[in-house]
Swiss-Prot record:
Localization per record: Cytoplasm
Molecular-function GO terms, alphabetical: unfolded protein binding
Name of the featured protein: Protein-export protein SecB
Gene coding for it: secB
PANTHER family found in the cross-reference section: PROTEIN-EXPORT PROTEIN SECB, PTHR36918
Primary role: One of the proteins required for the normal export of preproteins out of the cell cytoplasm. It is a molecular chaperone that binds to a subset of precursor proteins, maintaining them in a translocation-competent state. It also specifically binds to its receptor SecA.
Family, as annotated: Belongs to the SecB family.
GO biological process, one term: protein folding
Lineage top rank: taxon: Bacteria
Protein source organism: Thioalkalivibrio sulfidiphilus (strain HL-EbGR7)
Length: 168
């Protein structure tokens, strides 16, 4: 028997597992406060898109729910034409990963997986409400995650550089 075949060998790596168990539409809302008047005027859309994601453990066996919230507000002529909010969620199995990798999986990889489904729901709702097709650009969740880490790191560095007991 070689060292790698012996039970409890020091070289054993923890087994990592990652899988999408289920994805689902958790909540959806569409508001068209100016219908039908909005369809009679000139269409000059100004769109604001907001993204938010959160993850929470479902058990101690590595199941997590990741929820991606996509809020799209479109104004025309300075007034809200429509507001769509979609909460796309998924149950993911993620275990055996180091803390740093787990953070990336839950905050970047999982939302990347969920985004196409949320985008499709928004597009479908906007179209069914009678508005021109809404095409949302892809989102780089890896870059957003890296930006958040950098902001958190900068915030901690700023706190550490201030002398204890100092007031401003």
């Amino acid at each position: 028997m070689t060292d790698s075949q012996q039970p409890g060998a020091a070289t054993e790596q923890p087994k990592t597992e990652f899988a999408l168990q289920k994805f689902y539409l958790k909540d959806v809302s569409l508001e068209c406060p100016r219908s039908p008047q909005v369809f009679t005027g000139e269409w000059k859309p100004e769109t604001n898109v907001q993204l938010n994601s959160q993850a929470r453990p479902l058990d101690d066996q590595g199941l997590f729910e990741v929820e991606l919230t996509l809020t799209v507000t479109t104004k025309s002529g300075g007034e809200v034409a429509y507001l769509v909010e979609v909460k796309q969620a998924g149950v993911f199995l993620a275990r055996g990963f180091p803390k740093e990798q787990m953070g990336h999986l839950l905050a970047a990889y999982c939302p990347t997986t969920l985004f196409p489904f949320a985008r499709e729901a928004v597009t479908d709702l906007v179209s069914k409400a009678g508005f021109p097709q809404m095409l949302l650009a892809p989102v780089n969740f890896d870059a957003l995650y890296a930006q958040q880490l950098a902001q958190n790191h900068a915030g901690k560095a700023g706190e550490e550089s201030a002398p204890a007991g100092a007031s401003h």
